[in-house]
Amino acid sequence: MRGIALETVTKAFEGLVAVFDLSFVVRPAVITALIGPNGAGKTTIFNLISGLLRPSAGRITFEGRDLTRLPPHEICRVGIGRSFQTPQTFGHMTVLENVMVAAQVRGSAGWLAAGLRLPAALREEARIRELALTQLRFLELAALATRPAGIVPLGQQRLLELARALATEPRVLLLDEPAAGLTQAEVRALRDVLLRIRGREIAILLVEHNMRFVLRTADHVVVLNHGQKLAEGSAGDVARDPRVVAAYLGRAGEA
């Protein structure tokens, strides 16, 4: 199966069941949104997929390969990238250097070669630099390449998080509330960026509380409630589902 699949996944913490018997698929070139009230299990699912947690039952596969017992760095190398709700940047480093750090996951030169500045390590550094610059150009951040990341505005920090994730050359991209704190103009720009990323045949799974953004951006929506799947389908179908409206969308619309 192409994409990433959760197969009857359950996660319990000392008797508290955070996710129960959950199954869904995130496919290439599809933007899938994972929505639900606070405490529904969305962050737990991201942590399960990225290897920060392990399922209590069930399994997670990518292109047919079982990821359930792999550590986070191996999952990243397999092709699963992630951005975080709070940008995980190094404020004292430049924008370009931040992306280069993330791109190191695709590096092959050993620490000894790098420390001795051997020709292979220098070639590797040049390749990593170009990979990072490619992502900055794609996200229209190249003009900020030499600027310290700590002084970049929030909207551009969100894009920098995306650039860092893309620099790992993912085939699946996990985005944790990418629109949080953005202006309407920045949200529109973010939507355009995600559509362009989708055009690269990358599978996108996003958690987002901005329902207008979700309904305008996502191709497919999975709705959680108390750790279980409440509904699944197109954005339009989910928005009209009375169970979803009662459990979540009605309250989100009132907020």
Predicted regions and their residues:
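Glycine-rich phosphate-binding loops of nucleotide-dependent enzymes
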Residues: M1-A255
